[in-house]
Structures are given as structure tokens and as C-alpha cells.
């Protein structure tokens, strides 16, 4: 089974970027950086996401993946950022940046398409385009980079036809956007495992109820973490991804609950 903590990721975003989205209704002020988030939780794997407010910033000039203390062991970068993000003019993604960084930094293990399964995105990024992205990631360097997606329980609930696209990915990161749906996590995990050929899933763990724009209840937070631990131990998921550095320092009880949960994982 190995060390379960080695399977835990943090989703890291530019400080304050979520507070710029008024609909999230986040309290407080966020100053924590992604690397500080890793250090606070004492975990080693970072998934760096680009939001709309990061448009125009290249990863080569990104201060939030600079790791002077050696806190990070694995890194994933968004090939396509959040739903409001757009690539630089003349580009369709951040592939060139990712490959350039990966040549120098062996910690970079994957590229991820965030907020992917919207009709508008699937129309632009067809299965053929995704297959091309995957082939580049797998073969352009002296080692393969994995190709990950972000999927939500809402796509399962609506019955959206996403399978032709989803099967082009190596792994699905699965997220429960509305906290009330935590009560049906088994159903959504089964669906998430059906999306790729090998059924590989990293389970996303929200520390804020973004769907309802409010703090997640302590009961739902604990239930979500208990379920995640159970599936880590059973091997039904490859890992968990905590969301995110953007809500860890704004006074939410979920942060402390998660830290205590992590402290009991070996």
C-alpha cells in the first residue's frame, strides 16, 4: 500500500484569485501561496492551476512554483486552465511551456485540463485534439508525462455525453461541487472510474462548498475525508487532491479538520 501521504496532492492557485470571483462568496483574505500550503499540510505534491486572473502569465515566470526549500516532490500543471481562462493568442494550450519546464524539472509528472467537460470546450478540443495532446505528452520528452482531466458530479447527474472525450485521458480527477452530493460519493466514484480505460481516479476534496457558495459543514467535511481514506486504503483511487491553497488561510473550520485528518495518515 505504501505511504498514503505520498498519494495526497494540493491544488495550488494564485493567492486571492478565488476572492476575485464574487459568486464564490469567500470570507476573509487569502495570502497563502501554493508552496506554503504544501508546508502547512506537510504534503509533497502540487497541482498548479491557472485561473482567469492568471491569463498572460507563463509558467516560466510563475513565482508560485518556485520551491526554494525543496517542499515539493511532484508537480502537475494545467494544459488548459479554468473555464474562464483562455490561452495566449495563437495558441490552443500551454503545451510549449509545460514541455520546456519538464525538460529541466523531473518533478513535473503530468498536465491537466481543468473544467474540461463543458460543451463549448469539448467542441473546440475534440477527441482527435485530445489524442494529439496525449501523444505529445507521452512521447515528446525522454519520459512520458501523464494526461489528466477534471470532471464533476454534475456531468454524471445531467447525463452529459462525455465518454468519447474522457477516454483520451490517462486519469480523471473527480470533484463533488455541491456538498450535499457527498452523501452519494460511491455512485459518483463508480461513474468517475468508468471514464477512462483503466479506471484511474484521483479524488478531489473541496474544503469549501463552492456549489452553494458557503462554508462546507463539519459533518460533510469529515464524511468526505472518511470516504477518501477508505478508498485510498482499498486502492480504488490513486490519490486525493485537496482544494485549495486559496481557502486554507481564511478561517474555515474545514482547514483544521483536514490538517487533523492528514496528521493521522501514515
Residue spans for each PLM region:
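Glycan-processing catalytic domains of CAZymes
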Residues: 1-266
Amino acid at each position: 500500500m505504501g505511504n498514503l501521504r505520498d498519494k495526497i496532492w494540493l491544488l495550488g492557485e494564485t493567492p486571492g484569485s478565488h476572492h476575485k470571483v464574487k459568486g464564490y462568496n469567500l470570507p476573509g483574505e487569502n495570502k497563502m501561496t501554493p508552496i506554503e500550503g504544501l508546508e502547512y499540510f506537510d504534503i509533497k505534491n502540487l497541482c498548479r492551476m491557472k485561473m482567469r486572473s492568471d491569463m498572460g502569465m507563463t509558467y516560466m515566470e510563475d513565482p508560485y512554483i518556485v520551491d526554494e526549500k525543496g517542499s515539493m516532490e511532484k508537480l502537475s500543471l494545467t494544459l488548459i486552465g479554468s473555464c474562464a481562462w483562455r490561452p495566449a493568442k495563437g495558441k490552443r494550450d500551454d503545451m510549449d511551456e509545460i514541455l520546456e519546464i519538464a525538460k529541466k524539472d523531473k518533478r513535473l509528472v503530468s498536465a491537466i485540463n481543468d473544467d474540461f467537460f463543458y460543451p463549448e470546450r469539448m467542441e473546440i478540443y475534440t477527441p482527435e485534439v485530445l489524442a494529439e495532446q496525449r501523444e505529445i505528452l507521452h512521447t515528446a520528452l525522454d519520459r512520458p508525462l501523464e494526461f489528466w482531466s477534471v470532471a464533476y458530479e454534475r456531468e454524471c447527474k445531467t447525463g452529459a455525453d462525455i465518454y468519447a472525450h474522457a477516454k483520451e485521458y490517462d486519469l480523471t480527477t473527480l470533484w463533488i461541487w455541491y456538498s450535499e452530493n457527498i452523501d452519494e460519493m460511491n455512485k459518483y466514484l463508480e461513474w468517475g472510474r468508468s471514464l477512462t480505460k483503466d479506471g484511474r481516479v484521483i479524488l478531489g476534496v473541496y474544503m469549501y462548498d463552492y456549489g452553494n457558495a458557503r462554508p462546507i459543514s463539519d459533518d460533510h467535511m469529515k464524511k468526505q475525508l472518511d470516504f477518501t481514506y477508505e478508498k485510498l486504503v482499498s486502492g480504488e483511487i490513486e490519490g486525493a487532491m485537496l482544494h485549495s491553497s486559496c481557502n486554507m488561510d481564511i478561517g474555515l473550520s474545514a482547514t483544521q479538520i483536514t490538517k487533523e485528518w492528514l496528521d493521522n495518515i501514515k
